[in-house]
């Protein structure tokens, strides 16, 4: 029911009204939030339904979001059945409000074709509970410094996950704290409450003992704004979640304290228009913009686990940056077993079933030649500027400072974020981080670097940031 999947439904239905649209019960309700009339035919979970002669469709809960579905299409012929499994957006991890895609339920399906979303490519993430623990600590640190927090979130999904986490985590149970919700997020939360019977039993049990969302009695209190311009906030620090992202000024002006805006980490990985929009809203008011990780899709490890459990003949990667899809399709463990495809617009893909396995041609991977210079007190690694053309370069070079470690006989480089640098400094790990503070630099103005000789030139740099070109 996320907008990137649902935005074309109305136009599709207008042009092809005779074609039925199928969904899960929860998705049909959620589509009301996307201004799409609920014209869907609801299908039950885990029950094949014949939608055309010899063609059945079966839905499986895919994790990611309540109601999100993976789809098994089976076409029966006199010789054999042909199966296509489409994951949709999926996650194997258990979230606060939704179970992960069950590998046990899929055992034995063995589709001929697997169409797989691969949003994160080969990236590996910490366990879901570790992600939540880190976010809770991040929130706690900001509140401890008397700061307020604003979460701009989508209408569905991660916002409700954060609300449930704050309501149930032991660090916040009974805490004198106000959590406010604004925008369409209010109606989305009401829909969650209406559909509680469709949620995991653990969520239903929690809701039987205390309200899942709205509660002004049990701390932390959770409320919503009755009117757009009426923010009855107290002087104590608070948390606001909203899907209204056009202007943050009313929120910042509603409370005299300092503010921090927290956004999902994935928004900074590419030249994301929404990330730059958030920068434009926060920089002029000197409001820090920090990131957190609550992954909504499976990482590379869980993605390959699903592939090996289903054992398809053909594997089609979709729903991700080309670089990430290519990384995943370049894994030797996949190339040796499956026929791999990355489709492009307007190109037909042939999927011969049952024929002899043909090892796919190696997909082009970018390698960058360079040289090593050994100086008296340091080692310099030079590579071609071609490396900057990759969309991942921006994330690596964000602060201009990297961390290097050995992995077998290979040297792995990783860019360090401003938050990591600040943490290293606080923990007394000075070494390469013992640099002058950006806030005292001649070229640091309005939380931005204006030094053309700095690797941070043109980027947002908070006061505690570090730069090797400090002056």
What name fits each language-model region?
Residues 2, 128-132, 221, 241-242, ...:
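A conditional alpha-helix N-cap/helix-loop micro-motif detector
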Residues 2-180, 186-189, 196-199:
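His/Asp/Glu-rich metal-coordinating catalytic cores
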Residues 5-8, 45-101, 218, 225-239, ...:
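Core dinuclear metal-dependent hydrolase active-site scaffold
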Residues 121-124, 214-215, 235-238, 286-291:
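Short, basic, glycine/proline-bearing loop/turn elements
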Residues 136-273, 308-311, 317-326, 331-363, ...:
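Hard-cation-handling environments
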Residues 275-305:
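Generic long, charged, amphipathic alpha-helical segments
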Residues 426-471:
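Cysteine-centered metal-binding/redox modules
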